[in-house]
Curated annotation (Swiss-Prot):
<dbReference type="GO" id="GO:0000981">
    <property type="term" value="F:DNA-binding transcription factor activity, RNA polymerase II-specific"/>
</dbReference>
<feature type="region of interest" description="Disordered">
    <location>
        <begin position="117"/>
        <end position="140"/>
    </location>
</feature>
<dbReference type="GO" id="GO:0046983">
    <property type="term" value="F:protein dimerization activity"/>
</dbReference>
<dbReference type="GO" id="GO:0005634">
    <property type="term" value="C:nucleus"/>
</dbReference>
<protein>
    <recommendedName>
        <fullName>Helix-loop-helix protein 6</fullName>
    </recommendedName>
</protein>
<keyword id="KW-0805">Transcription regulation</keyword>
<keyword id="KW-0238">DNA-binding</keyword>
<dbReference type="InterPro" id="IPR050283">
    <property type="entry name" value="E-box_TF_Regulators"/>
</dbReference>
<feature type="compositionally biased region" description="Low complexity">
    <location>
        <begin position="117"/>
        <end position="130"/>
    </location>
</feature>
<keyword id="KW-0010">Activator</keyword>
<keyword id="KW-0539">Nucleus</keyword>
<dbReference type="GO" id="GO:0045944">
    <property type="term" value="P:positive regulation of transcription by RNA polymerase II"/>
</dbReference>
<dbReference type="GO" id="GO:1905905">
    <property type="term" value="P:nematode pharyngeal gland morphogenesis"/>
</dbReference>
<feature type="domain" description="bHLH">
    <location>
        <begin position="173"/>
        <end position="225"/>
    </location>
</feature>
<dbReference type="InterPro" id="IPR036638">
    <property type="entry name" value="HLH_DNA-bd_sf"/>
</dbReference>
<dbReference type="GO" id="GO:0003677">
    <property type="term" value="F:DNA binding"/>
</dbReference>
<dbReference type="GO" id="GO:0160094">
    <property type="term" value="P:nematode pharynx development"/>
</dbReference>
Length: 268
């Protein structure tokens, strides 16, 4: 079934073309509205003329309704403003060129890339917008390229406090000073326990006793000296050190007479 150009323009008063990546709308102004012969329409026309009066008016109404049904619907979104001049694309002579655009002439890769690049390009700072400062740019670059230290690397070594202070600020040096003060405190406590052991009633050849036993023995020895100041006969009936062997962690030999021996050695 062949369709002539006049019938095609009558059926489709608006055509669309796609050339060089651009959609264009063509409005066919010189359309020849010729009714399409239809057996059903002819039968209805004969029936109306024979049976119903005023057939001329009804026939015109039917023809207009049929023509409205045959015209394709146009969306309201494609409204062409009348204020701007209408630029009509040249109408091709062949119907095939209207229905099937030349695909070989359409750029496949160039056109979408240009559109995407135009969308992705950031806006350049104008005179009204403030330019980013150099300090902010340096901060962002330092955060982006932060140095990562692998703790499991074989070449990893403990840095010196001076190096830590240079890299991470003065906070690392304060931590190092705090650790140094803690070590000094532990050293002083150990020296105090050593001086306290020298005053206890234990021989110097005795093995070193623990800190807990040192404190327990010091408490009992202070009680013994207090009772001895009250009564000189307390040393003959002293029970201050009873049960110390059961509480102590090791077998410690206690001799009250060794106090004079320790004091004489300290005086020497």
């Amino acid at each position: 079934m062949s369709i002539s150009q006049n019938n095609f323009l009558t059926m489709f008063p608006v055509t669309y073309t796609f050339e060089n990546g651009v959609y264009s709308t063509i409005i066919n102004q010189n359309t020849i509205q010729t009714p399409i012969p239809n057996p059903i329409q002819h039968h209805i026309q004969n029936h109306i003329q024979t049976s119903i009066p005023n057939t001329n008016l009804l026939l015109e109404n039917v023809q207009t309704d049929v023509q409205k049904l045959m015209v394709p619907l146009i969306d309201q979104q494609f409204h062409i403003p009348t204020s701007t001049p209408l630029q009509l694309a040249p109408i091709p002579t062949q119907i095939q060129s209207q229905l099937q655009p030349q695909i070989s002439q359409i750029p496949i890769h160039n056109q979408p890339q240009i559109q995407i690049q135009s969308q992705v390009q950031p806006q350049l700072p104008t005179q009204s917008q403030p330019k980013p400062s150099s300090k902010a740019s340096l901060d962002t670059s330092s955060n982006a390229f932060k140095k990562y230290v692998n703790p499991f690397a074989p070449e990893a070594t403990v840095p010196l406090p001076v190096e830590l202070e240079d890299q991470y600020g003065p906070y690392s040096s304060s931590v190092w000073k705090r650790n140094e003060r803690e070590r000094c405190r532990v050293r002083n406590v150990n020296d105090g326990y050593e001086r306290l052991r020298k005053h206890l009633p234990v021989h110097f050849d005795e093995k070193r006793i623990s800190k807990v036993d040192t404190l327990r023995l010091a408490i009992r020895y202070i009680k013994h000296l207090d009772n001895l100041l009250r009564s000189e006969l307390h040393q003959y009936n002293c029970k201050c050190f009873n049960g110390f062997q059961e509480e102590s962690e090791g077998n410690i030999l206690i001799d009250i007479s060794t106090f004079n021996f320790n004091s004489s050695n300290n005086a020497m």
